[in-house]
């Protein structure tokens, strides 16, 4: 049987990435050109800057991904691409490159939801057993997803306001930490003590919804009031207290979801899945199901995860025409 090679593109935010997946499960290359240094001085991602960077490097990323995989353009079987959610200008760069490659070589084009990519990155660890539950935590999303089978995703709970990664970046900015602040807050949290009483919104409510705006506001108010009074607060203790509140919320809602949807597997994915504190809490508190977390290199935005997610779409022959457009607000269906 002839080997199948999927060339995948990911440009939904500030990483330009191209990957090659062989026969459903062998990731031959996963090239990532990060723009973090360009956005640090702005304290966040500037959409126009992100789009321009994608344009500048995407051709080189394609060439490097193919070379690293040891294949040529003629060996590629199909092209997969993120078409949402994300920044519309950034998405369009990846879409344009993917569609051009597919058209030039007469290849099928596979549309992939960015969040499905995060979830299916877990496939790189071990074959997934369905049905499963997923906790997706990133800079733009915090949601619990029920997956009845590969490619069938239903939201069962999500944030009412800020995403967890967004909350990390906002409190990091208040403390003067560099963007993105998640990793630094995690490191500082392990050096401090949970001594500040921050709110855990909706933690006792019988639903699967999250809220982080109250926690974020309480943190900002505490920091601001201390500054006004000329008081000095321990950055380590602030980070430890903030992270403890975040983890309490995530753990409480995830446990409720596992009670409501009895599954054997929990996938935890997205950029925040790289958080050491989250991994520690999962290891000690959720022991009755198989918890799968993608390796660190596949937690952030990358095309490898898009390639993994494209396999189920290929199997369903879910191909797109060349008029495929960006859907910046694309979302999974909600469980009825």
From Swiss-Prot:
GO cellular component labels: cytoplasm
EC number: 2.3.1.234
Molecular functions (GO terms): iron ion binding; N(6)-L-threonylcarbamoyladenine synthase activity
Cellular compartments annotated: Cytoplasm
Root EC class: transferase
GO terms, biological process: tRNA threonylcarbamoyladenosine modification
Annotated binding of substrate, by residue: 136-140, 169, 182, 186, 275
Pfam family, one: TsaD
Superkingdom, taxonomy of origin: Bacteria
Residues that, per the record, bind Fe cation: 114, 118, 301
Keyword annotations: Acyltransferase, Cytoplasm, Iron, Metal-binding, Transferase, tRNA processing
Disulfide bonds: none
Cofactor: Fe(2+)
Reaction equation(s) it catalyzes: L-threonylcarbamoyladenylate + adenosine(37) in tRNA = N(6)-L-threonylcarbamoyladenosine(37) in tRNA + AMP + H(+)
Bound cofactor: record note: Binds 1 Fe(2+) ion per subunit.
Biological role stated in the UniProt entry: Required for the formation of a threonylcarbamoyl group on adenosine at position 37 (t(6)A37) in tRNAs that read codons beginning with adenine. Is involved in the transfer of the threonylcarbamoyl moiety of threonylcarbamoyl-AMP (TC-AMP) to the N6 group of A37, together with TsaE and TsaB. TsaD likely plays a direct catalytic role in this reaction.
Similarity field: Belongs to the KAE1 / TsaD family.
NCBIfam families according to UniProt: gcp_kae1, T6A_TsaD_YgjD
Protein name: tRNA N6-adenosine threonylcarbamoyltransferase
Annotated gene: tsaD
